From Swiss-Prot:
Quaternary organization: Heteromultimer composed of HisG and HisZ subunits.
Biological processes, Gene Ontology terms: histidyl-tRNA aminoacylation; L-histidine biosynthetic process
Record InterPro entries: aa-tRNA-synth_II, aa-tRNA-synth_II/BPL/LPL, HisRS-like_core, HisRS/HisZ, HisZ, HisZ-C
UniProt entry tagged with the keyword Transmembrane: no
Cellular compartments annotated: Cytoplasm
Alphabetized UniProt keyword annotations: Amino-acid biosynthesis, Cytoplasm, Histidine biosynthesis
Gene label: hisZ
Protein name listed in UniProt: ATP phosphoribosyltransferase regulatory subunit
Family from the record: Belongs to the class-II aminoacyl-tRNA synthetase family. HisZ subfamily.
GO molecular function: catalytic activity, acting on a protein; histidine-tRNA ligase activity; transferase activity
Length: 391
């Protein structure tokens, strides 16, 4: 092992990228705060038996360790389950919706050949205690306004509904075991495999057509009427109606140009129970964020409540934005012992104006010309007199 190597999947964030990332994060959280979401933090370490089990992240992707008492801990793999834990135990005591936001790193072990980060930042919100379609529309509208404030102009939010898939698969296939195979094809977006498997099933031609029609249910509001024609149950009809209401509400927000329906969507997050969505941007091969309704998760913490939310991956958002990493505008004051006091006062005055200023003793510099190249302005306090140079 080389001394400069990092653990698999871990990455350094150097100063210029750090500043760019900070600006993007701030542009997201600014909008979320304006919508009344209050930000919070949770521990990086959680108990495996609570947050680890409830996180919906595959067990092999969890970073596990033992504490001194022999209890299994995990590095948090997402933020939804930790916030659900806090909301169930401390926050959601009153009978009114709770709006919280977060910006935090999460940890997921990756296969060595995958090349994906094992630690990445998520910025998002959770709306807890409101089971209405208005709440679903709010979080989708909020993610749209937040992304636009970050400077992203070309993106689309694909919206699905767990209830439509559940209803169709139960009606046609009869049990979850048979449905699981089709869900897997949809999750992997292996539509050829999905079609071939449907054709191989011992079903009537009508039922096969219903399953195959699911792949065509993508587009605008007209998709809902087509969806209604392939589901018979009350649960399925209700899910279609929810999507119609959601579309109408997002129209009131002025957001319908940024959304589309994809009723064959299956998420890797198993706790979603209703509306779910993924955010896609140009030139990025994976969703830059996702969200949805998870009405059963808080019940697992003995505090049943409806909830919905989303998380944006800042690393993928940066990939979509492709912002130029600009050198920070920092000034430097180079001083000698004789004028140290004057140099300190000058630097303090500049900082009060909002400027970033480095104080550097001349005695600590090896190559003064090389050092000053990285600063915007250079001011000297050396010997008996002061002189300035602007670079």
């Amino acid at each position: 092992m080389f001394m400069f190597e990092k653990p698999h999947g871990m990455r350094d964030t150097l100063p210029m990228l750090y500043e760019t990332k900070k600006k993007v994060r701030s542009s997201l959280t600014e909008v979320m705060a304006l919508w009344g979401y209050q930000f919070m933090e949770t521990p990086a370490l959680e108990f495996y038996d609570t947050v680890g089990v409830q996180s919906a992240i595959l067990d092999q992707q969890l970073f596990k360790l033992l504490d001194q008492e022999g209890q299994t801990l995990v590095l948090r793999p997402d933020m939804t389950a930790p916030i659900a834990r806090v909301a169930a135990s401390k926050l959601h005591k009153d009978d009114h919706p709770l709006r919280v936001g977060y910006a935090a790193n999460v940890f997921r072990a990756q296969e060595r050949e995958g090349g994906r980060p094992a630690e990445f930042e998520q910025v998002g919100v959770e709306l807890i205690g409101d089971g209405s379609t208005s709440a679903d529309a709010e979080v989708i509208a909020l993610v749209i306004f937040s992304l636009k404030n970050a400077g992203l102009t070309s993106f689309k939010i694909s919206i699905g509904h767990v209830g439509i898939l559940d209803a169709l698969f139960v009606e046609v296939l009869g049990n979850e075991e048979r449905a699981h195979v089709l869900r897997r094809y949809l999750y992997e977006k292996n539509y050829v495999g999905y079609r071939e498997h449907v054709k191989s099933l011992n079903l009537s031609s009508i039922d096969k057509s219903r399953l195959l029609e699911l792949l065509e249910l993508r587009g605008g509001i007209e998709t809902c009427s087509r969806a209604a024609s392939i589901v018979d149950s009350e649960k399925g009809k209700r899910a279609v109606l929810e999507l119609e209401t959601l579309w109408e509400t997002l129209g009131d927000y002025g957001c319908t140009d940024d959304i589309k329906l994809d009723l064959g969507m299956v998420s890797h997050m198993s706790y979603y129970t209703g509306v779910l969505f993924e955010i896609y941007a140009e030139n990025v091969g994976f969703p830059i964020g996702n969200g949805g309704r998870y009405d059963q998760l808080l019940g697992r913490f003995d505090s049943p409540a409806p909830a919905t939310g989303f998380g944006i991956r800042t690393d993928r958002l940066l990939e979509a934005l492709k912002p130029a990493e600009e050198q920070e505008k920092i000034d430097v004051v180079i001083f000698s012992t004789e004028q140290r006091k004057e140099a300190i006062r000058f630097a303090e005055e500049e900082r009060r104006k909002g400027k970033k200023v480095v104080m550097q003793d001349l005695a600590g510099i090896g190559d003064i010309d090389q050092m000053t190249k990285s600063f915007q302005n250079v001011t000297y306090f050396i010997g008996a007199r002061k002189e300035e140079k602007h670079g």
